[in-house]
Amino acid sequence: MRDTSPFYITTAISYPNGKPHIGHAYELIATDAMARFQRLDGREVFFLTGTDEHGQKMQQTAKKEGISPQELAARNSAEFQNMARLLNASNDDFIRTTEQRHHEASQAIWMRMGEAGDLYKDSYAGWYSVRDEAYYQENETELRGDGVRYGPQGTPVEWVEEESYFFRLSAYQDKLLKHYEENPDFIGPAERRNEVISFVKSGLKDLSVSRTTFDWGIKVPNDPSHVMYVWVDALTNYVTATGCLTDPTGPRAKFWPANIHVIGKDIIRFHAVYWPAFLMSAGLPLPKRVFAHGFLLNKGEKMSKSLGNVVDPFNLVEHFGLDQIRYFFLREVSFGQDGSYSEEGIATRINSDLANGIGNLASRSLSMIVKNCDGQVPLCGPLTDEDKAMLAAADSLIGTAREEMGKQLIHRALAAIIAVVSETDRYFAGQEPWALKKTDPSRMATVLYVTAEVVRQVAILLQPFMPESAGKLLDLVAVPTDRRDFAHLGEAGRLVSGTPLEAPKPVFPRYVAPEA
């Protein structure tokens, strides 16, 4: 039975103290593919992305540049919004944590946690990483040969002492472990789930949730000398956008709890430990799933400004094409694991899967139809076992894709679609429609019909991953725009014989590297 309930999906909100890099683009592309998939499958989707604009790091970066944190946030948030447009992301909202609606929601969640008796004031002393915006215990840090102490993410930590509000995280250890046990799909993939459970079992200490040493943040209700620790503020964005706290009868309130938060593996602790504890305290339902993807490595190396190997998504898209880049990252990298990429790898994937694969299949079969079948979808005659097997493979793809996308295994959904393209290539070559043209024209027509029908279904299924290019493929087989959703896959949407087709234009040209 198809699920038609509302579907709420989020990316992590990006920290705009610098320009967007390919890691931000990767998360947005993957989340967009999942959102589009659910929309095409008939669900009402709310897809959120945005920027996390408060905190000490923003204040320090702004000071270095001689501008206010507001100016830095506005300038760089605009860059992230430009990236979303460039990547053809279908987000329904873009949240900025400096917005009034977010201040109201953050203060509402704070008040609820206070009313639950989970906030108290004390003084804090411990190791703090400005870059990670995280506190670490001494045993999580190491003093290196350069005389600097580093946290577990390899970022410098400093000793901080100040008055702070604390959240009674220690009171939620057993409740969290019970939730993980009763909801085995709450955290994915499995290695992240194991990592979180092991962290929680090792014992949770109460969490410092306010700061007094800087003021660029959301003021604590009734105590304006404190600003909220950035993670209380940042995580609340997911609730803010639905209005479920500030506008409980509003149009988006029904979307909470989120179906899935898509995040990077480096922030799993905040999303799978602190966030559910805050929500339990505030009496709000928990998200259904938190899925952490891996890092993108440039030729096997982690990208960093110091190595000078940070890749600008704008340049990559300009060089290879948008859908080509979307396809490469979603197909090449096992979603949930780290993935390595290189320009050579992108070029190879474009040429093998797209230009020589679906592009070539569509071009060859549709050119033959235009030339030999009066430019119309041919008549489908009696089907042989090979024809039936080919159509059955295409018809069953939606089941496989739903299953894999339901587990966030985007790469496997795409692999299944491309496997059917390869199978159709073999079918087409084996049937030799060019030879049948002389010996058995009606059989040629049936082979061409079957091939074009597979192209139709593959194109419908490729829409979440390559929206524009898949749309062009559907134009080639003259599928009306109101018959491009998943409800029209299989027999429900078969090509209609006699439908006029235009001569195909190549959708995926081969990539040829520019000469140095």
Curated annotation (Swiss-Prot):
Family annotation (PANTHER family): METHIONINE--TRNA LIGASE, MITOCHONDRIAL (PTHR43326:SF1), METHIONYL-TRNA SYNTHETASE (PTHR43326)
Entry's Gene Ontology BP terms: methionyl-tRNA aminoacylation
Chain span(s) of sequence motif 'KMSKS' region: 302-306
SUPFAM superfamilies: Anticodon-binding domain of a subclass of class I aminoacyl-tRNA synthetases (SSF47323), Nucleotidylyl transferase (SSF52374)
GO cellular component annotations of the record: cytoplasm
Family annotation (InterPro entries): aa-tRNA-synth_I_CS (IPR001412), Anticodon_Met (IPR041872), Met-tRNA_synth (IPR014758), Met-tRNA_synth_2 (IPR023457), Methionyl/Leucyl_tRNA_Synth (IPR015413), MetRS_core (IPR033911), Rossmann-like_a/b/a_fold (IPR014729), tRNAsynth_Ia_anticodon-bd (IPR009080)
Pfam families: Anticodon_3, tRNA-synt_1g
Binding annotation for ATP: 305
Family statement drawn from the similarity comment of this UniProt entry: Belongs to the class-I aminoacyl-tRNA synthetase family. MetG type 2B subfamily.
GO molecular function (one): methionine-tRNA ligase activity
Catalytic activity: tRNA(Met) + L-methionine + ATP = L-methionyl-tRNA(Met) + AMP + diphosphate
EC class: ligase
Known function: Is required not only for elongation of protein synthesis but also for the initiation of all mRNA translation through initiator tRNA(fMet) aminoacylation.
Ranges spanned by the short sequence motif 'HIGH' region, renumbered to the chain: 14-24
Sorted UniProt keywords: Aminoacyl-tRNA synthetase, ATP-binding, Cytoplasm, Ligase, Nucleotide-binding, Protein biosynthesis
Quaternary state and interactors: Monomer.
Main location: cytoplasm
EC numbers on record: 6.1.1.10
NCBIfam families listed in its UniProt record: metG, PRK12267.1
Subcellular locations according to the entry: Cytoplasm
Name of the gene: metG
CDD domains: Anticodon_Ia_Met, MetRS_core
Protein name in the entry: Methionine--tRNA ligase
